[in-house]
Amino acid sequence: MKAHAYSTWAAAALACSTAIAMTGEHVAVAFRGDWVPAKAACTSPLKLVIDANVVTFVNGAQRAEFKKLEQCFSCMGQGVQEVTLLSTDKMGDGPFMITLDGSKKARPAVSVDLSNDKKLGAAFPLGSGALKKCV
């Protein structure tokens, strides 16, 4: 009985913390849009574009689009406020991890880890820090 109550509580807590990031297998509206490196101008040719079901890395005319997105609820452990998006476009390890942080509802945050794919990281050098949203 006690274990069941804990697992129900844990599932509810996880659902609440990730609700802002993903809704109905779509990226929540707060995270959709153009994201550039924190110190870059919004006119930067280097950006991450997040749509409901597609993530596109852009660097000038160069683009890499990923449509097979997957949420990873266990990537960061218990009690986190983030959702991690992975791509299943390729076999093996996903080429990237995008962290959607909805802990501050007024200012959602996005960061990218391209360390699993050196070519993608070289083509789209977004860094590992938080990105800023351009409106």
What role is predicted for each listed range?
Residues M1-A10:
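Bacterial N-terminal signal peptides that target proteins for export
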Residues W9, W35-V36, E65-K68, G127-S128:
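Residue-level signal for mature regions of secreted extracellular proteins and peptides
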Residues A13, K39, L69-C72, L131:
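Mature extracytoplasmic/luminal segments of secretory-pathway proteins
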Residues C16-T18:
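N-terminal signal peptide c-region/cleavage motif recognized by signal peptidases
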Residues A21-D34, V49-I50, C134:
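N-terminal helix-cap/turn-to-beta initiation motif at the start of protein domains
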Residues V29-V36, A52-V54, Q78-L86, R107-P108:
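Short, hydrophobic/aromatic-rich segments at coil-to-beta transitions
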Residues A41, G79-V135:
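Beta-sheet ligand-binding and adhesion/scaffold domains
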Residues A41-E82:
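N-terminal glycine/threonine-rich, aromatic-flanked beta-hairpin/loop signature
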